[in-house]
Amino acid sequence: MSKPKKIILCPNPYRDKDMTVAARSKEILDQEGFETVVCLPFQKEGYGAELGVPIQQLDREIKRADLLIAFGGDGTILHLAKTLAMNRVPVLGINLGSLGFMSELEPDELERLRDLKNWDLSIENRMMLDVSVVRDGRTVYNTIALNDAVISKGSIARVVRLEIYTEEGFLTWVGGDGVVISTPTGSTGYSMATGGPIVEPTARNILISPICPHSTRSSSYVLDPSHVIHVKAPDANRKFVYLSSDGGKAF
């Protein structure tokens, strides 16, 4: 692979508050001859202005980027995951958060960015989920998820019942707080907290783990990624059921 023309630096403005880490990274990469631009995963008014660093629009700049460096925790990478996947741009995480399972570098390792000049990279391909909500045969919501899709009862203090199918037929039902449908990358997240299995992140499986099941016989499932998983909420439960992908806003 040839040397990249552009690297996007994408600091979480609430983690790299004064842009110290991103600015130092930009200095190193500029010294190595890379074209660098600074974009934000989400907007914060005035961020970067005191340093005179222009903030560019991510949706525009990523179209011809070769790499994005995310400064934050796992949540920052998850927030960027859909945009990265749609543009087929790899991400390198520099951990500034409380969790850094997806990050490769810590702030005291920035000099290692100089190794990018050889562009001798090992890129891990991670499986993602294509998530849709279908009502009366019509798709009303669609997204992709790097970690998981969580179907839950929200804050309502009651048990919800969910029926789970594959294209081959009925699989199981869950009575409890909901279910986590996870990728291998997400197996160390909410899925693990429910008692689900930990899977090597580069594997290709779909994990199904009930949340606080009402039955002691409920168990997790590890399925081939070729399956299409259907989760149905009976009519009596539908208004109490919520979907959240990668910890985002509930639908």
Model-identified regions with their sequence ranges:
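ATP/NTP phosphate-donor binding region
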Residues: 1-67, 108-124, 133-143
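Short glycine-rich anion-binding loops that position phosphate/pyrophosphate groups of nucleotides
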Residues: 14, 74-76, 99, 185-187
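Short glycine/serine/threonine-rich phosphate/pyrophosphate-binding segments
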Residues: 18-19, 75-80, 188-193
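Gly/Ser-rich helix-loop-strand patches that form or flank binding pockets
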Residues: 79, 84-94, 101
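Catalytic core of DAGKc-family lipid kinases
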Residues: 98-177
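Structural signature of FAD isoalloxazine-binding scaffolds in flavoprotein oxidoreductases
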Residues: 117, 200-202, 208-213, 222-234
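ATP/nucleoside-binding phosphotransfer catalytic cores, i.e., glycine-rich phosphate-binding loops
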Residues: 151, 156, 167-170, 216-251
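Gly/Ser/Thr-rich active-site loops/lids in small-molecule metabolic enzymes
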Residues: 172-217
